[in-house]
């Protein structure tokens, strides 16, 4: 039961409601926060042939970010991984009329993808939904899937101390919106998790209520 939805992310009802809920919660800013993750991708893509680049969106959800990537890069090889079949069905609807993506129903910590097969891996608002040990397992799996020199583009909620004026909101958020793992996420050592997996820091910034971290596999 996440976000007061019985069945969590595994139901058709949740897939239909998710985007409306998120845009309402963030006062219409969820889309712009997601789009901030396109900037490091654009920097990485400078001088590269998009037809030769593979991007994997981990926990792609309803496909809003995959759609944004597809609009920006019509020929890029896209893969979306998600645990929820209803959410993957919603992703297919998001990509209707565009070149599609390979959609894979699987947990993020056990992706059926070859090692060193992705140039870019994106994680958009996933980690705050995960138990601490699963965050670490997913990070290790992302590092496995990335090619050497490949890019992780990570976008999630602010953490405590990122913007001290918002710390009260971050503290209240898990109770108000039934986020069972958010409280630990808000104080977790993301820098340490990524570094331990061999993902070296490139950039960290905080667009509105989100935290954007860019890491490169050594």
For the regions a protein language model found, what residue spans apply to each?
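Conserved Class I S-adenosyl-L-methionine-dependent methyltransferase catalytic core
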Residues: 1-44
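Conserved class I S-adenosyl-L-methionine
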Residues: 51-61
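Class I SAM-dependent methyltransferase SAM/SAH-binding core
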Residues: 56, 64-110
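A short acidic, Gly/Pro-enriched loop at the edge of an enzyme's catalytic core
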Residues: 109-121
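A short SAM/SAH-binding and catalytic strip from SAM-dependent methyltransferases
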Residues: 119-133
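C-terminal alpha-helical "lid/dimerization" subdomain adjacent to the S-adenosyl-L-methionine
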Residues: 136, 153-197, 203-205
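A short glycine-rich, Lys/Arg-flanked "PGG" loop and its adjoining helix->strand segment in the class I
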Residues: 136-148
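Core SAM-dependent methyltransferase catalytic element
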Residues: 197-218
């Amino acid at each position: 039961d996440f976000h007061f939805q019985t069945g969590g992310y595994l139901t058709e009802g949740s897939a239909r409601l998710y985007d409306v809920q998120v845009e309402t919660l963030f006062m219409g800013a969820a889309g712009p926060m997601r789009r901030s993750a396109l900037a490091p991708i654009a920097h990485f893509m400078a001088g590269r042939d998009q037809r030769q680049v593979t991007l994997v969106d981990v926990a792609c959800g309803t496909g809003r970010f995959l759609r944004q990537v597809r609009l920006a890069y019509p020929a890029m090889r896209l893969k979306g991984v998600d645990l929820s079949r209803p959410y993957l069905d919603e992703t297919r609807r998001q990509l209707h009329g565009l070149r599609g993506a390979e959609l894979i129903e699987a947990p993020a910590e056990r992706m059926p993808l070859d090692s060193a097969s992705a140039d870019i891996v994106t994680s958009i608002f996933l980690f705050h939904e995960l138990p601490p040990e699963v965050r670490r397992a997913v990070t290790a799996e992302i590092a496995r899937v990335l090619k050497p020199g490949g890019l992780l583009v990570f976008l999630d909620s602010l953490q405590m101390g990122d913007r001290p004026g918002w710390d009260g909101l971050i503290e209240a958020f898990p109770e108000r919106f039934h986020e069972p793992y958010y409280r630990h996420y808000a104080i977790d050592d993301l820098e340490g998790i990524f570094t331990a997996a061999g993902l070296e820091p490139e950039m960290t910034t905080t667009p509105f209520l989100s935290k954007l971290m860019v890491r490169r596999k050594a």
